[in-house]
């Protein structure tokens, strides 16, 4: 079986001063994200791939509810009945998110000091040459920073992404808010599953 080759290009990190966090995210997004900073149920989700760090899912990031209510979506993104094959969060998991060409999936969630990277699973379409862009914008009242990763594949198979850094610009409470934007830049449908954050700097 051919193994999917993922590439990550040009992780750019930039910093710029911004206004208050409420102006960046809006009151609803801020309140929802703050709730997610209170509970951490972790698992060694990527141990099969040599990564023994602990991870926890972002709100709605397993897609098992069948809803994308935790996300802002465009371009017909939806929940589909296919899971990443390792079922790292439970054998009963059966769903993922499908992103048709041009579709986007966006979520805002809270992280704390030391929660400095994330990973997810992606499945490329059968036609070669497509790509998935994963952008993170980290924001606090002190400032913001962005990372951008491009994932490409030459075969159709599920695979974990490399670690995606979350830049530390945490506020006085030790928290910061991440907006994740996943964009399908290809001509076929990508699947995305199990969006997970590494809660401690264990590397």
Question: Regions from the language model: what does each represent?
Answer:
Residues 34-36, 47-50, 56-95:
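Extracellular glycan-recognition surfaces and repeat-rich motifs
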Residues 2-15:
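Bacterial N-terminal signal peptides that target proteins for export
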Residues 71-73, 98-100, 111-115, 123-132, ...:
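Extended, low-complexity, turn-rich repeat/linker tracts enriched in Gly/Pro/Ser/Thr and Asp/Glu
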Residues 20-30:
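C-terminal segment of classical bacterial N-terminal signal peptides
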Residues 49, 53, 139-177, 183-191:
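Extracellular carbohydrate recognition and processing domains
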Residues 187-203:
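Exposed low-complexity, polar/acidic, P/S/T/G-rich flexible segments that act as propeptides
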Residues 89-117, 161-163:
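Short beta-strands within extracellular/lumenal beta-sheet-rich domains
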Residues 63, 116-124, 175-184:
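Extracellular beta-strand-rich recognition modules
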